[in-house]
Amino acid sequence: MSRLAGRVVFPGEAEPQSSSTNSRAPESSSSSQETRQQNLANRFKPSNNYRSNRNQVEDGETTNSNRGKPRGKGPIRYQGNYSDRFVGRQEEAPRAEKSERSERPQRSEKPQDQNQREQVKPQRKQTKRVENVVASEELLELEDIIDQISDLNVRNDRSAAQIKRNILGSHDLIDTMDEDDWQKVCESMIKTALEQGEPEFIADLMVALFSNKLFAAVMSDELMKYVTKYIMEDDEMPIPSLLSAILCAHWPRQLAKAFDNINPILYTIVCLIKGWIEVVREDTERYYKEEKKPKYQVAREDSFEEPTPEPSKEEEEKIIEEPEMVNRCAVGLSDLCDTAQRQLWVNWMTVTDEIYQCIKPSITHNPNITGSVKGRLLDTFLQMNQWTKNRTASVKHAVTQTVGTSN
C-alpha cells in the first residue's frame, strides 16, 4: 500500500466526517499553523483512513467488495475491470437470438395420422419386375416354341428372359411333347447357338429345361451327333464355343456334376473332351513318353519286390489315328480353352489339368501336328499359365531421362 497523504474519494460515496486531523475550517491563525504542522507529520506515518473508509456502508449506498479499488493520490474515478466490458455484450447476444427466432416463420406441425403422412410424403414408383410388366405369351403348338428360339423376326421384339418365360409357361404343351418333338426343339436350339452366335442363351435355356428328363436325354444325343460330325467331317461350326458355354453355365450345385445319372448333358460333353485328349496324348506317346518319377519307399527287412504288371493286349494294340484327326482334336482343345478362359479352370479343374498336361509335350515332340496348330496350342498354353496366378498388382518402376537443350 502506498503511503500517500491524500484521500481517495469514490463516486457515490459520502465524504467522511471531519476529524481533528483533516478539518479545514479556519478558526484561528494558531490553529491553522498547528494543523499544517500536524499534516506534515502525518505524511510520514501510515494512515488507516483509506482502509476505514473502504468498508464503510452508508444509508442506501453499498460498495462492491468484489472489485479491486485503485489506489492513488487525489480523487480517482473507478471505471471497472477489463472483463466488465463484455458483460453487456453477453447479455445482448441471447436477446438477439430470441428475437431472430421469433421473427422466423414457424414450421407446420408434423402430421400425426398415417393418412396425413402418406399425403405429405412424395410417393415413389416402385420398381416392377419384367413378369409384372410384360405378360407371358401362351404357346399352343410346337412351331411356336421353335419360332421363339430360332426365328429372328419373332425374337427381335422379345428379350431372352421373356422367351424363356414363354417356353416354361406353356406347361400343357411341354408335358405332351414326345421324343420326336424334343428332337426338333433340340436341333433348333443347337443351330441357333452355332449359326446365330448365341451359345450363352441356348446354354441358359438348357438349364431351365433340364427338369424334363426326356429333353436331357435327347439333347445329350444331339450334342454327340454334332460333335462327331465336327471331328470326323472337319465341320467348321464353332462346336467348342457351345461346349464351353454349356460347361460354364449357371447350373445348380446339385446338377453341376458330370455323372450319367445326375446330368447326362455334362457327362456327354466331358466324355467327348476327354476323347480329344486321349487322341492327342496317344499320338504324342509314339514319339515321347514321360518317365514316371520313382515313389519314395521305406526300406524294411520284410519288404518284397512287387511283380511288375505285364502290358495288356489293349495297350500293345493301340489305334493309330490319322494326323488330320489328331490336328482337329488339338484345335478343338485350343478353341475350348480360348472361349471359356479362366472360367473353365474354376468350374472344371481336373479337365483343365488334363488338357494342360496334354498340350505341352504335343508342342515339343509330336511331328504330326502342323506348325499352325502348334502356334495355337502355344498361345493357349501361355494363357493357361496366367489363369492360376493371383490377380495382385505388380510393382513397376518407371524412369524418365531428360536431355538438356543447348542455348
UniProtKB/Swiss-Prot annotation:
Residues 33-55 have a biased composition (Polar residues). Residues 1-130, 298-318 are annotated as: Disordered. Transmembrane segments: none annotated. Residues 86-121 have a biased composition (Basic and acidic residues). Residues 18-32 have a biased composition (Low complexity). It comes from the Eukaryota. This is Uncharacterized protein B0303.14. It comes from Caenorhabditis elegans.
